[in-house]
């Protein structure tokens, strides 16, 4: 009598595990993508902070929108929406002392973000009331990446 219910329960559990549970390889891939995203964001931040940038003061006047909360991969939608303004601000910093290639970095970040959040995301980003400077913006997304990576390990 209970045998049929038990078999149904086992079958449903197996279906759930095989279709929705992340595998160790997908977790590892996600972790690697997040590490690449983290490195790109850190590279931009270091490029802004690690030299005498006469344009830094001007760069700090530009404001970026931050999500009210960023705790899941779907929140990367908010980062994606700010990539174009980020590229425009980074283009201001181009000089002989600043050797980052904003277009390449932003393109890399965009590809990684799309892979991590998925292309079919219909998540609408809910932004905080306060805006952030470029340094605050990068630091918050760096912290986001570190936080997600720590949950995967």
Swiss-Prot record:
UniProt subcellular location: Secreted
GO molecular function: carbohydrate binding; cytokine activity; glycosphingolipid binding; growth factor activity; interleukin-2 receptor binding; kappa-type opioid receptor binding; kinase activator activity
This protein's GO CC annotations: extracellular region; extracellular space
SUPFAM superfamilies xref list: 4-helical cytokines (SSF47266)
GO process annotations (BP): activated T cell proliferation; adaptive immune response; cell adhesion; cell surface receptor signaling pathway via STAT; cell-cell signaling; extrinsic apoptotic signaling pathway in absence of ligand; immune response; interleukin-2-mediated signaling pathway
Disease listed for this protein: A chromosomal aberration involving IL2 is found in a form of T-cell acute lymphoblastic leukemia (T-ALL). Translocation t(4;16)(q26;p13) with involves TNFRSF17.
Record protein name field: Interleukin-2
Lineage: Eukaryota, Metazoa, Chordata, Craniata, Vertebrata
